[in-house]
Amino acid sequence: MLTIKRYPGAIEFTVHTSKSYGTQMFALCFISFVIGATSLAIGRSPKIIITLVELSFLLSLFHIISGVNHESLFVIRDLGVQTNCHSIVPWKSSSKLIPLDSIRDIFINEGFRKFDVCYYMGIAIESETEIHVVFPTLLPRHDVLQKVYKETVILLANNS
């Protein structure tokens, strides 16, 4: 889901994850916890079941904590762009400011991710050999990227 906020001389694009994803992971985590607590209360469960339930609980919890909540691109005329990746936990969040004079090119390209073709928006930076990918974790659909690309290029081209 794309959210656009407009400011004088700036625009912010935010891509959110599906809200049901976190709910599903919480349900899985809660169910595995209940099964584990019940088997401990009964006291006659085999140790392998308890170990598997604990393992599934910990994996579910790790998946929830390491997930990305939303990613954003903040475009400021005469200054540059800032990319943000917001995680559920604050210490996993990151941001990068790219000054306008170091932006060589902004583009949309297609790439492969596992066995799927996906589109990504990239920023070529003057002093770096690697491309900075915008929305690297969530990888929104092509039509969303086109909308972000058009408005970003228009705003950055209107330098005054």
From Swiss-Prot:
GO cellular component: endoplasmic reticulum; glycosylphosphatidylinositol-N-acetylglucosaminyltransferase (GPI-GnT) complex
E.C. number: 2.4.1.198
UniProt key word Glycosyltransferase: yes
Broad EC category: transferase
Transmembrane segments: 22-42, 48-68
Keyword Ion transport: no
Name assigned to this protein: Phosphatidylinositol N-acetylglucosaminyltransferase subunit gpi15
Organism: Schizosaccharomyces pombe (strain 972 / ATCC 24843)
